[in-house]
């Protein structure tokens, strides 16, 4: 059976983790600090904290915003359910936003409606690796916390941003708008990012969460990065970080894995894009469709999502007969957990939660496996 998800763990990752174990220093320490430095360079942020859970990252991001108790915090209906729970636990009011059916992203219009309902901050989930309308959303003047767990490495060329949109919400460091030469110069990634100036996913909001869980684009086996893109916003987060206990910090054994994953990102992403292009050609002859995205620059290839023409159960059974496991893309989302409560106001999200399947797409797939998946994409009912 070809599994839907598989972490890309090569010898470099294994060696890094084994070295950490041999040194008998697996708790938060030197490698946690090294991961932070690597993240600062890769994501072009002013500062970062490596934490044990994504929920902790969201908690400290919201604390850094200093929202009043009971304030409304807007979430995508397709955001992971832990975000809803975290917002409630902190004493804020979750306000769910519906998404656009063609991209699975919240729109500026949806955010505007959320503000009218009392939203005072937005956690911007960039689902499926697709980037939203940053310019339209930021123009509303609401504090934004980006969630780039699936969109890490995404990139918006300056040609697509107005002067105001390019500034984001804070004073970005200069590297955020330089050509992404470090990430784009490796073989197979194409010349696109190496030659085009722009802004990276994670540099548009005030703070950014990058979950490092097993099925995220970059994995540490668990944990999260919390980043501040701008120099003006980092001191607030830094002050909070100084009071964080070691039990909430990411252990070195996880940090070792994450550091290598970030350094190997371009190599892995180049392979994922090759597979995505191949799969995309396959679905052109089938009954089901993909999502609107710019594969070359704007989006990250987290997996291969497909909006099904029929029911998921039938598609799952068909794929299983061909020894391929597929899963619902949003099985852990807010709308999946709270369908009865929010179905009426989040109709698009509910439909996508029921009919969006993800197919196996990861670098270590073999030729025979890739051919099998491609054939199923063509013939899937």
Task: Report residues per predicted region.
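Conserved PLP-binding active-site segment in aminotransferase class I/II-type PLP enzymes
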Residues: 1-64, 68, 90, 366-372, ...
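Histidine-centered beta-alpha loop that forms part of the nucleotide-sugar donor binding/catalytic region
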Residues: 78, 92, 99, 126, ...
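Active-site phosphate-binding strand-loop segment of PLP-dependent enzymes
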Residues: 102-165, 173, 178-220, 226-232, ...
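Conserved PLP-anchoring active-site segment centered on the Schiff-base-forming lysine
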Residues: 61-114, 319
